[in-house]
Amino acid sequence: MTSASNSPESYLSSKTRSSKLDDNYLKELNEDLKLRKQELLEILKPLEDKNNLLFQKLMSNLEEKQRSLQIMRQIMAGKGNDDSSVIELIKEAEEMKQNLERKNKMLRKEMEMLWNKTFNTEEFSDEEKVLQIKNKTDLQDGKAPKTPSSSRKTKNELETLCAEKGKEIRKRLFLPPGKETEENGMGQVSGTSQHHSE
């Protein structure tokens, strides 16, 4: 009987100690999330006008992560030692985790598509500007202007060049180091080569 009366006190003191440690850990995680939020703001600032929707999704995603951390804190604290409320909180945290994982996958795909599109259009417009300047200088030097067929050929070469540069960037951004994909198709997206088994 005496051992039974002593155990709740020792259990509570050890629980208090562990919840303090857990709370410190969760505070560190929260600080880390704030830093990541700030980094995202800086990364996405130049693209903010074009990518407002994506930006909002990323921010709401981070806010959801912070809410899940608050739930974790409540679980760790044991909120009034009521097991049923702790179980409910655990279920809620699990649902939130699965939801966040789904959202993260979708966001990664959207960001990859958006970056590819932005990069390709910017590269293409830069190359066209260079060509226009070159044509003007050729005319001033007395050289014959390019025929429509040759300019079409140049445009195709530019598109090929943009596609290849886009592939290189996708590899650097989304593939783990050392993982090379062998792609010979002109406009092939990296995602399609990875899922060819499906």
Curated annotation (Swiss-Prot):
It comes from the Eukaryota. Residues 24-117 form a coiled coil. Residues 135-198 are annotated as: Disordered. Transmembrane segments: none annotated. Residues 187-198 have a biased composition (Polar residues). Residues 135-144, 154-167 have a biased composition (Basic and acidic residues). Keywords: Coiled coil. PANTHER family: COILED-COIL DOMAIN-CONTAINING PROTEIN 196-RELATED (PTHR37863:SF1). This is Putative coiled-coil domain-containing protein 196. It comes from Bos taurus (Bovine). The gene is CCDC196.
